[in-house]
Amino acid sequence: MAPRRLLRGLRRSMGGAGLALCVGLASPVAAEVITGARFEGPTTRYGHAILGDGIEFTELVIETEDWANKVRYRVTLPADHVFEDLEPRLWDITDDGAPEVVVIETDMARGGSLAVYDQTGKIAETPHIGRTNRWLAPVGAADLDGDGRIEVAFVDRPHLAKVLRVFEWDGTALVLDMELGGLTNHRIGEDFITGGLRVCGGMPELITADADWSDVMVTRVVGGALQTASLGPFSPAAVEAALACR
């Protein structure tokens, strides 16, 4: 449950739209590995305020390292997009042993999407929800069904539709794989997302609430389909216990 805050720091960007090399030179000897990411460029140009304030972000700074160098890249969004998010997530989506950067990227006319970046720019994105002021809340990423490919899960419109959607990385894109209704992980105005991914006994599972916030729910893939069950009455302590496999 990450607190919402303005992340400040690097200001030595080359400027301009898209991806900019900010600091250092990449080494030709060893591959760069992403070690950190943060949002910059706070903006009030999108008034959704789903996370409790009217401040979103226009820039994503990605930090990488190789054997000799530390490099920073800056992604600057076009004027009709914002990062409607808390913090960037370092999740391995491509299953190469190194993380990518996963963010909520919102088109101000078409709503939220889940976008994946690396140091080359955006490498994948789920479809935008379809209209303004519509958002999604990430849950986690893992090989949920044991097929050797990574799936990434989020709740589509956690205040309205309350549908858990699972997209699979197919080697070039994120493709819708499974979905299940009746689950949520965010309430309007909260500056955190409830639940997440846990691995208990070697099995990745998704922790959320049910649609009316009465129960903590655990969802796993069984026989190629999502299966959900209650872990008991909802409370913040119960969510923490569930994530810790207690």
Language-model regions, residue ranges each:
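N-terminal secretory signal peptides that target proteins for export/translocation
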Residues: 1-10
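Beta-propeller-forming repeat regions
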Residues: 4, 28-246
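Bacterial N-terminal signal peptides
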Residues: 13-26
